């Protein structure tokens, strides 16, 4: 149960952004799309705050399109891998493995080949708060899957964290540190062979 909550929290998405009164540049959505589409790979440390307040950390790897890996450090030690447009989650403590289609997760947006913040995705909130851009989106055809709030530094534009508001109304926050963009990643990181 803990594994599923962590997985859902790590993959699903976020709270509605408030308003700061700051005027946003008219092209900000286009700038965010360009920024996200310019990311071929991402490697970072993460800290996660689960809905129950538990804290965990580890490493995240993204290789667009379609591949993602979350490695949780002890005591969690969970592993989440997205490849072939499916997400495989393995909890070694319970020895349980769960598989879901990427498109059933709000974080699937970050794995798309061509990221668009319209059409399949609807923007629910857009605000600048304390020099950060908060962009909240949900899947247009599946609003019940949850929301994803992406938080960017503004100067320069950079992804700092995201929050997932899942279908049960629970929020999980993931903060990124030591982010490296467009660096080579070993393809073995995204193998699910040992997870089943």
Residue ranges of model-derived segments:
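Short, solvent-exposed helix-to-loop capping segments enriched in aromatics
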Residues: 36, 106-118
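Cleaved targeting-peptide boundary
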Residues: 19-29
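Bacterial N-terminal signal peptides that target proteins for export
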Residues: 1-7
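Gly/Pro-enriched, hydrophobic low-complexity segments
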Residues: 118-196
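An acidic-aromatic
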Residues: 59-109, 172-173
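A short, Trp-centered hydrophobic/proline-enriched beta-strand micro-motif
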Residues: 34-53
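Bacterial N-terminal signal peptides
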Residues: 7-17
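Extracytoplasmic
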Residues: 39-41, 55-57, 63-65, 75, ...
């Amino acid at each position: 149960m803990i594994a599923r909550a962590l997985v859902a929290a790590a993959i699903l998405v976020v709270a509605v952004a408030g308003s700061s009164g700051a005027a946003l540049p008219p092209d900000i959505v286009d700038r965010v799309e360009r920024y996200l589409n310019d990311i071929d790979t991402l490697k970072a440390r993460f800290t996660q705050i689960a809905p129950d307040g538990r804290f965990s950390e580890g490493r995240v790897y993204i290789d667009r399109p379609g591949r993602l890996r979350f490695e949780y450090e002890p005591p969690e030690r969970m592993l989440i891998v997205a490849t072939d447009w499916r997400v495989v989650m393995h909890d070694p403590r319970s020895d349980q493995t769960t598989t879901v289609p990427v498109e059933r997760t709000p974080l699937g947006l970050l794995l798309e080949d061509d990221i668009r913040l319209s059409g399949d995705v609807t923007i629910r909130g857009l605000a600048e708060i304390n020099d950060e851009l908060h962009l909240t989106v949900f899947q247009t055809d599946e609003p019940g899957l949850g929301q994803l709030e992406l938080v960017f530094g503004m100067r320069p534009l950079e992804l700092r964290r995201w929050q997932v508001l899942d279908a049960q109304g629970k929020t999980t926050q993931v903060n990124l540190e030591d982010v490296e963009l467009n660096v080579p990643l070993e393809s073995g990181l995204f193998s699910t062979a040992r997870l089943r």
